[in-house]
């Protein structure tokens, strides 16, 4: 068919599909991301505020951890979800800097917005940002100080990094207490692996935060026990510990079975055989010489009383996570049978005891020779407080872990961002054209961190930033915001330290997220189906193999 000079309209998308594109779409996405950034801004820094979030199921959370807040905010805008993803990635990779990375990404987008409105191609902005971030990372690596070259002990340096991570958290007033706990926890791990999953955290409501305990070994809540456990000893010195994955319980058969017997004696023989089987298992356990028997599966009332008569402590239904950490701490291995257990299959520790902590009883294994694991028992008034203490300790533990692995640190309090910003401004003066403006915009965006730190603390941000620019232009590379004096100062000398990895990861993630948003200029939203079952109903009469009614 001949359409002449006109091109026919071709409809590809079904009716109701929403498609928007062009410069306006990029700006709309930027506005959505900036809205998320504005929600997080007040939480940044040691004097930042906390946010109270009530979820749809009425669960209350109080936190100033960026990743936690974004996870609970239930962000629905597809572009803004990018910020949630980079915050989670930062949390998983380095543990801290989750708020900073979101604020940086939002600010980079905000700085790109005027260029887009003036008609500059988004690809030019992305090219400028990529160049700027590579220069910024190069500068941070140049600034970073190897903590092993410092005169102080390694432990003292790790404590300083942990203290900086805690400065913006709920526990900053108890930092002296929790800093030691964090460093002890990380140093108890295997130096080659540093697997933070082996640090167990148990939350016990009640008491003060400083009643929290560090156990150089394993502690777990007392499992369900049958009658007879009262007679079992609750404390051992240098016990032998047997870990099982065996059910020590006399119970009915799981499968339907039928046994035909001719005489009562035959029935009695079957019953006796069941008892003999369970007693044989119990005798084999006793012969190993173990003082403590742990099992992932239930230990029944018969076994509990059998062990109590022989001064053996037992605990069944121990979680797999706790059991694995027990093995890591006391040695030995988990046995799937009670026969042929050798002495090397048993573990040991200096002290085992069951003790009351708050309203719960806990089993504690201390002084473990193989200890590559530890447990933190956290106390606190309200559940929300303990949950926030756990999140704060997680951030500090990750920071200590990264500092131990990478050993390169920089100063916090906005000092690093100001120095990198000054370096980028100097570089931008050496080039011409649009790239100069874009790199300058990147440098300006970095100043959002010290500016927001000042605003959250109630300081005059304009005055402090002017002082910082002047100090950095004179070569004071570690000058940042000092909260005690409401002024500026050398944050490196004041031990406000952060691993360089936190800054590098935050800059890379924020720039990648910004470039991703800038590269998307079209959004297609498919119309939702009328109902969840639309198109799923069978035609009339087509069910159950019947034909159509006549």
From Swiss-Prot:
Disulfide bridge partners, by residue number:
none
Biological process annotations from GO: chaperone mediated protein folding independent of cofactor; protein folding
InterPro entries noted in UniProt: Chap_CCT_eta (IPR012720), Chaperone_TCP-1 (IPR017998), Chaperonin_TCP-1_CS (IPR002194), Cpn60/GroEL/TCP-1 (IPR002423), GroEL-like_apical_dom_sf (IPR027409), GROEL-like_equatorial_sf (IPR027413), TCP-1-like_intermed_sf (IPR027410), TCP-1_chaperonin (IPR053374)
Which keywords has UniProt assigned to this entry?
ATP-binding, Chaperone, Cytoplasm, Nucleotide-binding
Reported function: Molecular chaperone; assists the folding of proteins upon ATP hydrolysis. Known to play a role, in vitro, in the folding of actin and tubulin. In yeast may play a role in mitotic spindle formation.
Complexes and interactors: Heterooligomeric complex of about 850 to 900 kDa that forms two stacked rings, 12 to 16 nm in diameter.
What's the name of the protein? T-complex protein 1 subunit eta
């Amino acid at each position: 068919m001949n359409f002449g000079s006109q091109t026919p309209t071709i409809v590809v998308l079904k009716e109701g599909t929403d498609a928007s594109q062009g410069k306006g779409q990029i700006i709309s996405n930027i506005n959505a991301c900036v809205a998320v950034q504005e929600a997080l801004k007040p939480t940044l820094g040691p004097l930042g505020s906390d946010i109270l979030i009530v979820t749809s199921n009425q669960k209350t959370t109080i936190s100033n951890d960026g990743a936690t807040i974004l996870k609970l905010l239930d962000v629905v805008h597809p572009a803004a979800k990018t910020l949630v993803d980079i915050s989670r990635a930062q949390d998983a990779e380095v543990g801290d800097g989750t708020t900073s990375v979101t604020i940086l990404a939002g600010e980079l987008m905000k700085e790109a917005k005027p260029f887009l409105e003036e008609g500059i191609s988004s690809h030019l902005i992305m090219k400028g940002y990529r160049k700027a971030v590579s220069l910024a990372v190069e500068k941070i690596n140049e600034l970073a100080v190897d903590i092993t070259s410092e005169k102080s002990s390694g432990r003292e340096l790790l404590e300083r990094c942990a203290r900086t991570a805690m400065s913006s958290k709920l526990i900053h007033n108890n930092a002296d207490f929790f800093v030691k706990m964090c460093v002890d926890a990380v140093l108890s791990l295997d130096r080659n692996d540093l697997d933070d999953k082996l640090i167990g955290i148990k939350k016990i409501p009640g008491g003060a935060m400083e009643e929290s305990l560090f156990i150089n070994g394993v502690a777990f809540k007392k499992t369900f026990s049958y009658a007879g456990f009262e007679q079992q000893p609750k404390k051992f010195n240098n016990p032998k510990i047997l870990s099982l994955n065996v059910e020590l319980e006399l119970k009915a058969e799981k499968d339907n079975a039928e046994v035909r017997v001719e005489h009562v004696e035959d029935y009695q023989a079957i019953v006796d055989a069941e008892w003999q089987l369970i007693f044989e298992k119990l005798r084999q356990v006793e012969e190993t010489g173990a003082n403590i028997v742990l099992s992932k599966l239930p230990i029944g009332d018969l076994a509990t009383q059998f062990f109590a008569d022989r001064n053996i402590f037992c605990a069944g239904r121990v979680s797999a996570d706790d059991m694995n950490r027990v093995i890591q701490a006391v040695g030995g291995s988990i046995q799937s049978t009670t026969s042929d257990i050798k002495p090397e299959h048993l573990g040991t520790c200096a002290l085992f005891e069951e003790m009351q902590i708050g309203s719960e009883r806990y089993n504690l294994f201390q002084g473990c020779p193989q200890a590559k694991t530890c447990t933190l028992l956290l106390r606190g008034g309200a559940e929300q407080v303990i949950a926030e203490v756990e999140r704060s300790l997680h951030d500090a533990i990750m920071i200590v872990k990264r500092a131990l692995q990478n050993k390169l640190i920089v100063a916090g309090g906005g000092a690093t961002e100001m120095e990198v910003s000054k370096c980028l401004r100097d570089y931008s003066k050496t080039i011409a054209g649009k790239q100069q403006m874009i790199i300058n915009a990147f440098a300006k965006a970095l100043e959002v961190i010290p500016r927001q730190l000042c605003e959250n603390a109630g300081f005059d941000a304009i005055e402090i930033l002017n002082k910082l620019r002047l100090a950095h232009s004179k070569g004071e590379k570690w000058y940042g915001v000092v909260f005690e004096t409401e002024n500026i100062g050398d944050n490196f000398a004041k031990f406000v330290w952060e691993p360089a990895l936190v800054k590098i990861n935050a800059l890379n993630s924020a720039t990648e997220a910004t470039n991703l948003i800038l590269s998307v200029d079209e959004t297609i939203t498919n119309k939702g189906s009328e109902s969840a079952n639309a198109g799923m109903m069978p035609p009339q009469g087509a069910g159950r193999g019947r034909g159509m009614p006549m």
